[in-house]
Regions:
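Structural micro-motif
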Residues: 72, 78-87
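Short pre-active-site segment immediately N-terminal to redox-active cysteine/selenocysteine motifs
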Residues: 30, 37-40, 82
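Non-catalytic, surface beta->alpha helical segment in thiol-disulfide oxidoreductase systems
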Residues: 90-115
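Conserved helix-turn-beta segment immediately C-terminal to the redox Cys motif
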Residues: 29-31, 48-66
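Conserved Rossmann-like nucleotide-binding pocket used by diverse enzymes
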Residues: 12, 37, 62-64
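Conserved redox-active cysteine motifs that mediate thiol-disulfide chemistry
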Residues: 36-50
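Short, Lys/Arg-enriched N-terminal segments with co-localized hydrophobic residues
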Residues: 1-10
Length: 115
């Protein structure tokens, strides 16, 4: 493959299930951003690269994605009724929740508000 065709992909965002949430996310010392999404959701697809970029730029922020079709019990526990929904938790407690598409600037502002 030519050098110009090579791409380094850094996966800063991981998809989690309910067990990972209970074992890792709830007890995290970091501010956690959970992106509730579905593969068929247009606004979720538009938001995904922004979430990846935010995660890559904030090493002090834990960023995870939850597919509401695969982990509905977690979506229900946060009363997620529409997607995309962004949930910020700290020390296991809900700090902020945002429903609908958000720009990078809006997400950056939410991060600062939650710190």
């Amino acid at each position: 493959m030519p050098k110009c065709m090579e791409r380094k992909v850094i996966m800063a965002v991981r998809h989690i299930d309910f067990e990972e949430y209970k074992n890792e996310i709830v007890n995290s010392d970091k501010l956690v951003l959970i992106d509730f999404f579905a593969t068929w959701c247009g606004p979720c697809k538009m938001l995904s690269p922004i979430i990846e970029q935010v995660a890559a730029e904030h090493s002090d922020l834990e960023v995870v994605k939850v597919d509401v079709d695969k982990v509905p019990e977690l979506a229900v526990s946060y009363n997620v009724m529409s997607i995309p929904t962004l949930v910020f938790i700290k020390g296991g407690n809900l700090v902020k929740q945002s429903v609908g598409f958000a720009s990078k600037a809006e997400i950056e502002k939410m991060i600062e508000e939650c710190r």
